[in-house]
Amino acid sequence: MTNIRKTHPLLKIVNHSFIDLPTPSNISAWWNFGSLLGFCLIIQILTGLFLAMHYTSDTMTAFSSVTHICRDVNYGWLIRYMHANGASMFFICLFLHVGRGLYYGSYTYFETWNIGIILLFTVMATAFMGYVLPWGQMSFWGATVITNLLSAIPYIGTDLVEWIWGGFSVDKATLTRFFAFHFILPFIVAALAMVHLLFLHETGSNNPSGLISESDKVPFHPYFTIKDILGALIFGLMFTTLILFAPDLLGDPDNYTPANPLNTPPHIKPEWYFLFAYAILRSIPNKLGGVLALVFSILILVLFPILHLSKQRSMMFRPLSQCVFWILVADLLTLTWIGGQPVEHPFITIGQLASIIYFTIILIILPTTSLLENKLLKW
């Protein structure tokens, strides 16, 4: 008798995705982040659901409702901190997942890569809207500054901003619609993640060597289910440590002050995971130029398959490209640091230099290094 998991219409899909899936035998721990991102999404949807049961999306009561969750709801403080820090863990996993894709040449799977970029944008939009909901000072001013960037779009900009706000400033209408979108977007993310997996399973996973692995594949279960569970346990340990020992480490103290449209905080800045893009935005004195640089700083990922000029897929055997890659990582960390600093003397120049280096590495240095390595192969 054939096993039910191979015949049942629903179980068959699960079987082909997580049990009998042929997987390259040499994929390293860098391939754990896909499952960890799924884990993060489940945590965020569940904690968000319980928070939404007690939250009110009204400018008068939003801040108080979050306080009420933390003080009066059973384990409300835990749910709130899981949700807030869950977003940070989500982005850590996202950045590592994208970095892995860049290092090992996974972007040559066009469809999977492009769906991944759409996923990244969707998660960023979700996180931004979620940051507005507690209606603290940084929530309000962050929403005002970031939505205002759309006014840089010629001709329709101002109308577009007022349309998004639902009025002439960030107010009740804005908060209500942001709550509605913040609630629905994670489910769209989940649907997109399934499409992402669908395209991935059409080609099979990449592996560290970047070579075709048809001749050396093992079933996903038990080998990689165990590996993913270990990854989830390590993730859980780090996550619980963060929540229980330093829950406010990655947050902004200004957000513990209720939103006040009459009082602007001295340094308006987004959450830490947007700081690199914020630094690129600020490094250009022109408003429209800054907005374009901000969007292109992430949209540039689309160009990686086109800019891949190397004869080898992975960077595993390309020491020069490895060097350039790690300089890019250091540059992104520099941009993150600059994004959190005030707009004054040394930081402005450092930010501008780091922004130039970021685009130069991706558009010029990496492709040139690839061509040089191709020459060295013949030498």
UniProtKB/Swiss-Prot annotation:
Subcellular location(s) per record: Mitochondrion inner membrane
Binding sites annotated in the UniProt record for heme b b562: 83, 182
Binding residue positions for a ubiquinone: 201
Binding site for heme b b566: 97, 196
SUPFAM superfamilies: a domain/subunit of cytochrome bc1 complex (Ubiquinol-cytochrome c reductase), Transmembrane di-heme cytochromes
Transmembrane segments: 33-53, 77-98, 113-133, 178-198, 226-246, 288-308, 320-340, 347-367
Membrane topology label: Multi-pass membrane protein
InterPro entries associated with the record: Cyt_b/b6_C, Cyt_b/b6_C_sf, Cyt_b/b6_N, Cytb/b6-like_sf, Cytochrome_b, Cytochrome_b_C_euk/bac, Cytochrome_b_N_euk/bac, Di-haem_cyt_TM
Major location category of this protein: mitochondrion
Cofactor: heme b
Cofactor remark from the record: Binds 2 heme b groups non-covalently.
Claim: Iron is one of the keywords in the record: yes
A cellular-component GO term for this protein: mitochondrial inner membrane
GO MF annotations, alphabetized: metal ion binding; ubiquinol-cytochrome-c reductase activity
GO biological process, one term: mitochondrial electron transport, ubiquinol to cytochrome c
Pfam family, one: Cytochrome_B
Protein keywords: Electron transport, Heme, Iron, Membrane, Metal-binding, Mitochondrion, Mitochondrion inner membrane, Respiratory chain, Transmembrane, Transmembrane helix, Transport, Ubiquinone
UniProt superkingdom: Eukaryota
Function: Component of the ubiquinol-cytochrome c reductase complex (complex III or cytochrome b-c1 complex) that is part of the mitochondrial respiratory chain. The b-c1 complex mediates electron transfer from ubiquinol to cytochrome c. Contributes to the generation of a proton gradient across the mitochondrial membrane that is then used for ATP synthesis.
Note: Heme 1 (or BL or b562) is low-potential and absorbs at about 562 nm, and heme 2 (or BH or b566) is high-potential and absorbs at about 566 nm.
Family: Belongs to the cytochrome b family.
PANTHER family: CYTOCHROME B
Subunit and partners: The cytochrome bc1 complex contains 11 subunits: 3 respiratory subunits (MT-CYB, CYC1 and UQCRFS1), 2 core proteins (UQCRC1 and UQCRC2) and 6 low-molecular weight proteins (UQCRH/QCR6, UQCRB/QCR7, UQCRQ/QCR8, UQCR10/QCR9, UQCR11/QCR10 and a cleavage product of UQCRFS1). This cytochrome bc1 complex then forms a dimer.
Name of the protein this chain belongs to: Cytochrome b
Record gene name: MT-CYB
